[in-house]
Amino acid sequence: MGAYVRYVHSLVDQHEQQQLPDRAAMILMLHCQLLGWDQSLQLEEQADCPAESEFDRKVRLYTQVISLYDKASWWERAIALVGELKDQHEKNKCDFLQVAEYLEMQASFYRKVRTACDTLLAS
């Protein structure tokens, strides 16, 4: 699996260099899909990832994907992914400060969707 993850990250880097954040995000999600939400499972350093818990790695990768979705103006996808992070922090970590930050992030993306819709309707 290590070679696969390294390949995924090299593709992500290539697509980011080509300014294709939508494709980079889709590719990075392939790594995310390999991970669960286990806080006790410690993962070794791999590709661009330091040694960390499976939970922390998935959060970090999701955060990268959300940033790429934002660059690609895929705010609906970002909203869904932020919602999953919010749910995990609410149910599994009881980190309500982080939950509040995720809700603010979702609100920001909803405002971007609204602004884009208003712009389209005004055209």
Protein language model regions, located:
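Nucleo/cytoplasmic regulatory scaffolds in medium-to-very-large eukaryotic proteins
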Residues: 1-123
